[in-house]
Regions:
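Acidic/His-rich, metal-assisted hydrolase cores and their charged scaffolds
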Residues: 1-227
Length: 227
């Protein structure tokens, strides 16, 4: 089971899985796409001009379109989702949401978390306070919504937990610093408003020291005057 965001990260993982399958490095098993992944992927095929050259050419040729590989299967219904949860044969499931805080991934988590033979692979950042972060950090028991009685029920986490680094939708520190050095006209002030507070403060200090720009990390509800 791989928790993913429907746009961007899903397609990156799909390309990796399709490549491994075509090279014979991935066992022959179905890959199920649950949530809005199928619809979001269709947009990538509909507008290949926005993809890199290699992928664009494959999409134009159609028969080589990796997004239309036979290994990918759309989860069409709740009943189909339940069938997948109950199957004994190996399978890979990509499901939203990426931080395991809602969406169809919760149903797979409910069914597979207690299973020693199941594995959850994280391919994206897990924000503080999310279910994804708790599982990633080794929680042995989680509480999930009880659909029948309301409230929550405890669920043991016996499945294997893996984190695959390298997938990122953001520029890294080096790329951001280079951007700030070359942007014209030169900004008068830089605001950092997305990220862990401690890392934002560290990055702001580096910007002030190395790029010589006024950089601030605003708090929630803080007002900053630009004029």
């Amino acid at each position: 089971m791989i928790p993913v965001f429907a746009v961007g990260r899903s397609q990156e993982v799909m390309l990796v899985l399709e490549k491994l399958h075509s090279e014979g490095k991935l066992k022959d098993m179905p890959v199920y796409l649950d949530g809005m992944i199928w619809e979001a992927t269709a947009l990538h095929s509909a507008y290949p001009e926005y993809l890199n050259n290699n992928l664009r050419n494959k999409v134009y040729q159609n028969q080589d379109n990796p997004f239309r590989s036979e290994i990918f299967n759309k989860v069409e219904s709740t009943d189909m989702r339940q069938e997948i949860c109950g199957r004994e044969e190996p399978a890979i499931v990509l499901a939203t949401s990426g931080m395991v805080n809602g969406g169809p991934v919760m149903e797979y988590l409910r069914n597979w978390a207690p299973d020693f033979n199941s594995t959850m692979v994280f391919v994206g950042y897990q924000a503080a306070g999310t279910m994804g972060q708790r599982v990633q950090q080794g929680a042995k028991e989680i509480h999930l919504h009880d659909r029948e009685k309301g409230g929550t029920i405890p669920v043991k986490v016996n499945m294997n937990i893996e984190t695959c680094e390298g997938f990122s939708g953001h520029s890294d520190k080096r790329q951001l610093m280079r951007y700030l050095r070359t942007i014209r006209p030169r900004p008068k002030i830089v605001l950092l408003n997305h990220g862990d507070p401690q890392k934002c403060e560290q990055f702001a200090n580096d910007i002030r020291r190395k790029v010589r720009l006024d950089c601030r990390v605003p708090s929630n509800l803080e007002t900053i005057r630009f004029m």
